[in-house]
Regions:
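Function-determining sites in protein domains
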Residues: 16-169
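Bacterial N-terminal signal peptides
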Residues: 2-12
């Protein structure tokens, strides 16, 4: 009976265990990239924790920072420009082995110099993985990207695209 209870608890509370894990890797994939971009620098990764932002608080906790994860939570978007390059941004953590824990989509508009982040909705790929990790409550919605994320992602994407075209950065 005790072993059944232990197994039940292990299956019922994985998100609580994940919450202690730091982001160990971020990958950026896009059709215009020659290869996925991989971010592994611990100082950079420390800025982009999946377990921050909307939907991660508790009753006695202070409200989440308006800018965290890779999102500016204060700027939800009803719509965003169309025809932009879409990048799949994947977050990994070591729990205890490295595994995929969360996926969002990032698009950048060079005309306005703004980036946008999309959280997959209920009927879309990655929704189930995401809500099993953490339910932000904003699934299926767009937000403006956080400037700290823009400062990391845009140069990496531009550099990868320059290499693909055969030019040097």
């Amino acid at each position: 009976m005790l072993s059944v209870l232990v197994i039940f608890l292990l299956l019922a509370i994985p998100a609580e265990l994940f919450a202690k894990a730091e982001t160990s890797k971020i990958t950026i994939k896009g059709t215009d990239l020659s290869a996925p971009i991989e971010i592994r620098d611990p100082k950079t990764l420390a800025n982009f924790a999946v377990w921050t932002g909307t939907g991660t608080g508790c009753t006695p906790c202070p409200p989440p920072s308006p800018e965290s994860f890779i999102v500016d939570w204060s700027q939800p978007m009803a719509d965003h420009p169309t025809g932009l390059h879409r990048y799949e941004v994947s977050f990994y953590a070591k729990i205890p082995d490295e595994r995929l824990i969360y996926v969002v989509f990032y698009e950048y508009d060079p005309a306005t110099e703004h980036g946008y982040v999309y959280f997959p909705g209920r009927t879309e790929e990655w929704y189930r993985l995401n809500v099993n990790t953490i339910f932000h409550g904003v699934e299926g919605k767009w937000f403006r990207a956080w400037s700290a994320w823009e400062g990391v992602a845009r140069p990496l994407i531009a550099g990868s695209n320059a290499l693909r075209r055969g030019t040097r950065c």
